[in-house]
């Protein structure tokens, strides 16, 4: 039986429906907003696993090309492996929901939201969060939800709830806010140097709409929700738990405060190993081993948190608002176009910049249509960065961290008109002990400045943490990996000296209040300004010149009606020019022409040729041409592809010329001056006037 609930999301009508589609799933919801629709399902495995200390949750968002009536591109007409955008939306759904599942449920949970219709006006990521939460809420899977999300944009001096794609492009800030009735559980967004107060205003705007969307889900649950499965606490108990606790706790409390990540881990492992040897026979049982590991995790959690709340003592000895020592260096690699190393404590990022032509940009085949990105940032996290062995390659984490750093730096990247290059930044994480994505923002800024990219302002990032027992709390600046793992919040903020450009927050408690977030933002600003001051001591402005190994690029405009003349039949003209000058020539529909190549003179010569080809010949100007044919009365010279003129024998020299071939040869490149255009449009050229420099115009030989 079909059950429906209607409401609004921002100014747009919203439909939630269940009981008709995907009925064999534990829970399924069809959500529609205008012409965009999401089908979200959730299933759990039948078999329960004992002793898990995490939630085995997988979210696989996917978007179908049929949603917009589009055929998939490429040879295979079927959706393939998840695109980066699908992975990012999957993470966006996972993060606010994961803390609300019961760890002791012990079953694999699979959430599959699918975009099955899109009007290409309304973004479907926040709709997928609502649909996924609704599916879990009315399922039989235990869940401390519902969760809802809205996007808030700041546009023309006011906040807009769930803006359209065009409104997002014009906004100075856009942020996705997810939460429950109790408060906010996730924040992610980007901005163009906005203040902390403006961001907090967006969070306040979001909360009322989140509550309304949670109410819609509860109403649907009241109509067709299933009875929740009972969470049965694990019957397995660690044998000798109290004795193990007594043996390990005091030694672990000392080991956790060894200086240095490696030293701490070694000291803690030694304690664990010594205690395990005393219970070796018992720990051969897999369940007992998992319970033993869980107890040590519980003790580390307790020690770290109590020392921070009771004594303000962090494991590396810092004050709660202190930043680790910072070291910056640029120009660390000889050949790349720009490079820098940023080290903060035991976190280190090597960022390398490559400059390319505009045609080198990344093309994305989204369901809304193709788009080109001319600022690219790739984040790599090899296992050696944490002293481990493991699989090399790009996972969801790398894509997510790279997206955050990309968003944080995008606000300061120059427009193509100012800097007509594709810019690629690669961050290699060489060491990691917390906040590697924010280290990427810092190293990325340094490498861009070293490469000569005229960014608007330097950007720095910092990760904030939270420890709370429900009454007391401590906000930590520049958190370590252990503080992230054992803490209650990871709040990353990036920006310039004048405002925020990127942010991301995840919490492990049910919600975080707006007042606490305000305090965290203010503390983050102080830390960010400190980091920027250190970075500015190394490099504070773009290098005057780009690398001699970078391609040379000229960008200019031609008349739109001349684009066809430049391209030529079947691309013949532009290909001929590219081959002749050994450059790459690209043309946009608005008449923007970009010429790129390794040699500056070749790029300049090609530009001159394009300008000459696409403008009407002017009497009095000097052109560089090629002798095409020699006849008795002179030579025909091609001044640009398809345009020839006659250089009469009398215009070859001041003295008498008996044979034209005594002066010129076919294929010879010469400069000629256009001295006349007759009534039939024929061009009359002069070699001697060009040699004597009587041009009054452009000398293309320079």
Curated annotation (Swiss-Prot):
Catalytic reaction annotation: RNA(n+1) + phosphate = RNA(n) + a ribonucleoside 5'-diphosphate
Positions of the S1 motif domain: 620-688
Highest taxon, organism lineage: Bacteria
Location in the cell: Cytoplasm
PROSITE patterns in alphabetical order: KH_TYPE_1, S1
Magnesium in keyword set: yes
GO cellular component, one term: cytosol
Iron-sulfur in keyword set: no
Main location: cytoplasm
Biological process annotations from GO: mRNA catabolic process; RNA processing
GO molecular function, one term: polyribonucleotide nucleotidyltransferase activity
Pfam families registered for this protein in UniProt: KH_1, PNPase, RNase_PH, RNase_PH_C, S1
Domain KH: 551-610
Enzyme Commission number: 2.7.7.8
InterPro entries xref list: ExoRNase_PH_dom1, ExoRNase_PH_dom2, ExoRNase_PH_dom2_sf, KH_dom, KH_dom_type_1, KH_dom_type_1_sf, NA-bd_OB-fold, PNPase
Chain sites annotated for binding Mg(2+): 484, 490
Needed cofactors: Mg(2+)
Keywords per UniProt: Cytoplasm, Magnesium, Metal-binding, Nucleotidyltransferase, RNA-binding, Transferase
Role: Involved in mRNA degradation. Catalyzes the phosphorolysis of single-stranded polyribonucleotides processively in the 3'- to 5'-direction.
Family indicated by similarity: Belongs to the polyribonucleotide nucleotidyltransferase family.
Protein name according to UniProt: Polyribonucleotide nucleotidyltransferase
